[in-house]
């Protein structure tokens, strides 16, 4: 009897093993059903999946991705798919809600940007300008159509490589039986992107004119990666004639800098183009944001690469012609955050402005979490400093062994945590000090003094968070010492920095990068 049971169990095991093998074989031979959001995601995913899947796209040409809201039918398509691929939550802002509504657990959700850090979107940037190296805030800055962060990474061939790698890795992990094909397809596609990247680098690295003027501020990453300056203008759209007042101011701006072209995301109507040419003396040209291609265009052979090369050709109408440096219409750099304010605007603050639990950013610098930040800063500096030099600079600035600080504004206490050991002291407000830095911008230190005689190195503390009047801090730089407030005023090289303890390292990196 025991032998029969063992034989039966053995047969059952063999049967299930065979069934599993068959299931894997069916999956390997079958096609993965993938739903994507808009054209670049569709194009990249199709290039990776190849013949191993059916790739579809929710948004058709003519749909504005920034304003798109999925229908019930669209959500069902996602629900019925094997995988759903999108670019970023700052582009497809509806994705988080769709994720919550999905009842099927089988759908693999892939975010194209993965763990990429983004820059601030237009309208959300504090316009923090890299300033003098001796200023404690000058080179460390924090957290923009209106996105909190700019999602248009696909318009830079250099960054598109990372997007393709992210999609490849996620799909390969979800479908290991097809991973070999996905990786081979992705390798071929990435080689094409590398060639495109080389073309952009060759054409733009020695551009005679580094600035271009655009109506749609979607080309920030492209400008950043190839050494250009994107300058966006307001009040000019391709299908509506500008007001007489706007034409007048635009005409002055165009003449001042010798601007020959303003770039639109689509062909400007003949009336708009004629008005710009006649009244402002500037031509309209198209830089495609590549948010959609029609079936007709795709059948005619147009794709990501043809459109991006056309963009490069059009961009060279500006970059190949020498001229004076083009600056934005308005200087938005002289903000309070950047240290430009009047003395009368500075107000006293209470410890409650910094209430909460705070963590040092220094460990994230040490473990590499902030490395993308240094890469971005190096590109923004346009050769003034390398990523390694930025990291060294911030290593000096951020360095501290006080890993956590807890502040109770009501009790007026600060608790310093070092290697798990806590020290708590009670503080009184000791006034404010306005400091002027070598470049001409300024900062405010808000000073506090411990009541306890045994406070030692924590006797005197000073907060700096780019604000000059009462408001709740999102982060801060803290200076402390046991000698005097005056001695702390001279400290410009070392500024331990703290963010909320509820933030992850990546969230902090994103905040720093966008400021």
UniProtKB/Swiss-Prot annotation:
GO MF term set: zinc ion binding
Location of region: His-rich loop: 129-148
Binding site for Zn(2+): 66, 152, 216, 291
Stretch forming the signal peptide: 1-28
Record key words, sorted: Ion transport, Metal-binding, Signal, Transport, Zinc, Zinc transport
Region annotation Disordered: where it falls in the sequence: 126-148
GO terms classed as biological process: cell adhesion; zinc ion transport
Pfam families on file: ZinT (PF09223), ZnuA (PF01297)
Keyword match Protein transport: no
CDD domains associated with the record: AdcA
InterPro entries: AdhesinB, Bact_metal-bind_prot9, Calycin, Lipoprotein_PsaA-like, ZinT_dom, ZnuA-like
Family matches, as PANTHER family: HIGH-AFFINITY ZINC UPTAKE SYSTEM PROTEIN ZNUA (PTHR42953:SF3), HIGH-AFFINITY ZINC UPTAKE SYSTEM PROTEIN ZNUA-RELATED (PTHR42953)
Family under the similarity heading: Belongs to the bacterial solute-binding protein 9 family.
Entry remark concerning the domains of this protein: The His-rich loop facilitates the closure of the zinc binding site and is required for zinc acquisition.
Role, per record: Part of the ATP-binding cassette (ABC) transport system AdcABC involved in zinc import. Binds zinc with high affinity and specificity and delivers it to the membrane permease for translocation into the cytoplasm.
Listed name of the protein: Zinc-binding protein AdcA
